Swiss-Prot record:
Chain ranges for the short sequence motif Bipartite nuclear localization signal as given in the UniProt record: 163-173, 191-198
Stored InterPro entries: Gln-Leu-Gln_QLQ (IPR014978), GRF (IPR031137), WRC_dom (IPR014977)
Organism of derivation: Oryza sativa subsp. japonica (Rice)
Record lineage: Eukaryota, Viridiplantae, Streptophyta, Embryophyta, Tracheophyta
Protein name per Swiss-Prot or TrEMBL: Growth-regulating factor 8
Residue ranges constituting the WRC domain according to the UniProt record: 158-202
UniProt domain QLQ: residue ranges: 107-142
C-alpha cells in the first residue's frame, strides 16, 4: 500500500511540518479509480481498493501477477512473481528450486517458505471465486536432498541400521557396530540368552592290576596278641606312601645281611618287593614301638591288622633303618631262618612251613615278665627263640645268642 497526499492533481508530497496541521480537501481519482483518502493521526492515507484478479488461462502453479487497479498509482499486494518473469513459486514441473532459495526472507527455512507460498496460492483462488485445483489440495512432497536436506525417515525406521540397538535400559544406544546381519554387537549378542554349563567329562578311573603277591606280616591285634599271618591275595596293588621311606627300582637280594640296633621307642620303615616280574616297590607305613607298664612288645607288619579285616599285601620284607648307636636294649641280630606263628596255631602248626623267612630285627627281648604260663623254645643255628605268653595275654618273643646270654628264664 502506498500513502500519499496530492495537491492540485499533481501528487507532490508535502513536508511533514505542513502536513501536521494541514488538511487535504481534495480527492484525486484517476481513471475511474476506486481510491479513498482518510486522515489517521494527522496523516492522509490513501487506501487503494484492489479489484479481484481475473484468473488467467494458465494455471496458478505458473507465474502469476496480481496488481491493484487504480488511477495513476496503486498499491501492490503480495506478489509471488519473480522480477525476471521466471516461475517464482517453483511448484510447477518446470519450477526452479534455486528461485525458491533466492526468495527466502526472514527467519523462514526453505521448506517453510514453500509451504507459505502454497497456502497463499490456495487463498488467492478462494478470494477470486475460482475452483482450487486438486494439485494444490494434495500435499506437496518435494525432496530437498540435492541441496543438503535429506529425506527424514519415519519414526519406526532405524536411522543407523548398522549400529547396535542395545540400550541397556538407558537413553543412548550402544556405540558399537552390529555383527553381520544381527541387531547387536559382539558384546550384547549373547546378553539375553541363558548361559549353559560347560560339559565336564568324567574322569576315568585307572586301576593298576598286579600279580598276586605274598606278604608275611607280624602285627599286634586289638587283643594285644602278636599275630603272624600268611595270605594269598589276588587283586589290585595298593601303594601306601610314606615320606620317610625310600623307594628304589633295583631288586633287593634275598640274602642281604642287615645289622640294626633297635630301641623300644624307635619307628621302622619297611619296604616290600612283590613277586611280580616287574619288581615294583611298595612303601609301607612305619610302625611304632610301644612300651607300657614295663613290658615291651614289638608289632611289625605291612599294615595294622585290625578287626575291620583290612587287606594286607604279602611280600618279603626288608628292614631299612638308620643305625642307632645308643640303645638300652639294642642287640646285634643276624638274619636267620626262623619260624613265625600266631596264637591260634601256636601248638598245632608250629612245625609246618619250616622254610619261611623271617625278617631280621622283628623280635625284641622283653625287659620284664610277670609270670610265664607257657613257653616254647626253638634252636636254630646257635640262636634261641623263646615264645612266652604272659598272664596279661601278650605274646612276646625274644631271640638271644647263647654266647651272650648263657641262661634262660
Amino acid at each position: 500500500m502506498l500513502s500519499s497526499c496530492g495537491g492540485h492533481g499533481h501528487g507532490n508530497p508535502r513536508s511533514l511540518q505542513e502536513e501536521h496541521h494541514g488538511r487535504c480537501g481534495e480527492q484525486q481519482g484517476g481513471g475511474g479509480g476506486g481510491g479513498q483518502e482518510q486522515e489517521q493521526d494527522g496523516f492522509l492515507v490513501r487506501e487503494a481498493r484492489a479489484s479481484p484478479p481475473s484468473p488467467s488461462s494458465s494455471s496458478f502453479l505458473g507465474s502469476t501477477s496480481s496488481s491493484c487497479s487504480g488511477g495513476g498509482g496503486g498499491g501492490q499486494m503480495l506478489s509471488f512473481s519473480s522480477p525476471n518473469g521466471t516461475a517464482g513459486l517453483g511448484l510447477s514441473s518446470g519450477g526452479s528450486m534455486q528461485g525458491v532459495l533466492a526468495r527466502v526472507r526472514g527467519p523462514f527455512t526453505p521448506t517453510q517458505w514453500m509451504e507459505l507460498e502454497h497456502q497463499a496460492l490456495i487463498y488467492k483462488h478462494i478470494a477470486a471465486n475460482v475452483s482450487v485445483p486438486s494439485s494444490l489440495l494434495l500435499p506437496i512432497r518435494r525432496s530437498l536432498h540435492p541441496w543438503g536436506w535429506g529425506s527424514f525417515p519415519p519414526g519406526c525406521a532405524d536411522v543407523e541400521p548398522r549400529r547396535c540397538r542395545r540400550t541397556d535400559g538407558k537413553k543412548w544406544r550402544c556405540s558399537r557396530d552390529a555383527v553381520g546381519d544381527q541387531k547387536y554387537c559382539e558384546r550384547h549378542i549373547n546378553r539375553g540368552r541363558h548361559r549353559s554349563r560347560k560339559h565336564v567329562e568324567g574322569r576315568k578311573a585307572t586301576l593298576t592290576i598286579a600279580e598276586p603277591s605274598t606278604v608275611i606280616a607280624a602285627g599286634v591285634s586289638s587283643r594285644g596278641h602278636t599275630v603272624a599271618r600268611q595270605k594269598q591275595v589276588k587283586g589290585s596293588a595298593a601303594t601306601v606312601s610314606d615320606p620317610f621311606s625310600r623307594q628304589s627300582n633295583r631288586k633287593f637280594l634275598e640274602k642281604q645281611n642287615v645289622v640294626d640296633q633297635l630301641s623300644p621307642m624307635d619307628s621302622f620303615d619297611f619296604s616290600s618287593t612283590q613277586s611280580s616280574p616287574n619288581y615294583d616297590n611298595v612303601a609301607l607305613s612305619p610302625l611304632k614301638l610301644h612300651h607300657d607298664h614295663d613290658e615291651s612288645y614289638i608289632g611289625h607288619g605291612a599294615g595294622s591288622s585290625s578287626e575291620k579285616g583290612s587287606m594286607m599285601y604279602e611280600s618279603r620284607l626288608t628292614v631299612s633303618k638308620e643305625t642307632l648307636d645308643d640303645g638300652p636294649l639294642g642287640e646285634v641280630f643276624k638274619r636267620k631262618n626262623c619260624q613265625s606263628a600266631s596264637t591260634e596255631i601256636l601248638t598245632e602248626k608250629w612245625t609246618e612251613n619250616p622254610n619261611l623267612h623271617c625278617p631280621s630285627g622283628i623280635l625284641q627281648m622283653a625287659t620284664k615278665f610277670n609270670s610265664i604260663s607257657s613257653g616254647n623254645t626253638v634252636n636254630s643255628g646257635g640262636t634261641a627263640v623263646e615264645n612266652l605268653i604272659t598272664d596279661n595275654g601278650y605274646l612276646t618273643a625274644r631271640m638271644m645268642n647263647p654266647h651272650i646270654v648263657p641262661t634262660l628264664l
